[in-house]
Amino acid sequence: FTRYLSALKTIANDLGFKIPLVVNVHGFDQHDYAKRGLRYPIGLSQLKDTMSIPGSILAGDYYIGDLVMDNYTDVIMADALTASLQNPDQPLFSAEFQGGFQTDHPILQPTTIDLNSRLCIADGMNGINYYMFVGGYNWHDSGLFGKIHDWQAPIDINGKLRPSYHTIKTLGQTIRALGEDFLDSKTHVDVTIGWDPDIYMTEYWVKATKAMQDRLSHIREVGLFGLGRNLSLNNITYDALDLSSKPLDPKTHPTLIVVGTPWMNGPVQQKLADYVHQGGKLALINEVPTQDYYGSPCTILSEALGLTLSSVEHWGFASYDSYDSINFSELHIYEHDKGFFESHKTKATAGFLKTVGKGKVLMLGILMDHERLFKADIWASLISKLDIRSKFVTDDRVTLIERRSEKTIYLSALNLDEIRKTLSIQRNGKPLFEGHPLILQARQGLLLPLNKHLDHGVILDYSTAEL
């Protein structure tokens, strides 16, 4: 892909085009009215090396369908993984941000356009190109879908303004009211997910590698995206780090979560081992790698952390705290003295915390589907053992993400449910908004400033309404 795009860029430059090369990453799939982004890491693994082309910009192809509780966490994961690979001097960007869709299934609601935009902006996205924004015609039937190219666009074929147009316009006015200080703000994260894009390069396979592809695909969908879902459901904001090419320092990334797979190249294993010994706190989920990507034995990480596998269980039930019937797909049991998350069948425990060098390892040898919301509470409790927790406590479900500038906090509050909510929120143990409730209508989002410096020396302590 990199050689191909580099050649195209050379041809374009020779013809007089002196513009940036935008690399549009695919990966969202049609599942029904709500799409999923489970294969988005495949697109990133294919195209990450294009960032070596001078002037290239990495961008996402974001078609999520209707944004609901079932799929919004996929967007957050896509944001984090994209930002981990893009050039550092570019903004997080979607060059093909869902402003409509090529067919009328699903019929996109204006609330989806609004909530999806707000979610990505909260995640740090400073560049959005709505596609399509204006419908039109493919003359001479040149389009793949014929002449009509309406795309549910905010401005339809005949120039009529759809409700989504006014939604986008209102959001733009909200952003402008916050000023350049908001554009300079960064998303505040609580923890980092470490990942290696090559792990998810699963689009090509032969008979000899089919089992490996199936295994990695399952871990991607259940392990990686399950982790992201449970973090987001608990309002724990995360970013991502490319372990294959970026430095890993406990000072800049004090806490790291990695979803383990059977395969991991030696340099990445060594990087994680050094990280822990130097004082990093590592939560290792699922299993410890034992091979490199070519299937050769590679146990650098397990030896450095003193992790010895004793058994593996499939499809059973476990107990943890007050939960006595937690279904799992896999338990990887490593030798330890005192643990938690106990198998009903063998009484072995899959979770434990140990000190290694100057750092700590939280081993969670657990792989389980996330089909029930109570499992988010379980994961919140498990990772809190490594001091990974949300800064927020709420009395009802709501998505909360902060962007911070030097002086101001910009709080995004999103209600993805179809009911009005009156929320009491605590932030860092103290009542937010001096204890006043935050009211969110059904499927509404708000972008609220805290400690906002206005004109004439006025400081706005907080607001429960948008400026």
Predicted regions and their residues:
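Carbohydrate-binding surfaces of carbohydrate-active enzymes
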Residues: F1-Q30, I76, A83-L467
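Glycoside hydrolase catalytic-domain groove-lining segments
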Residues: D32-H105, N116
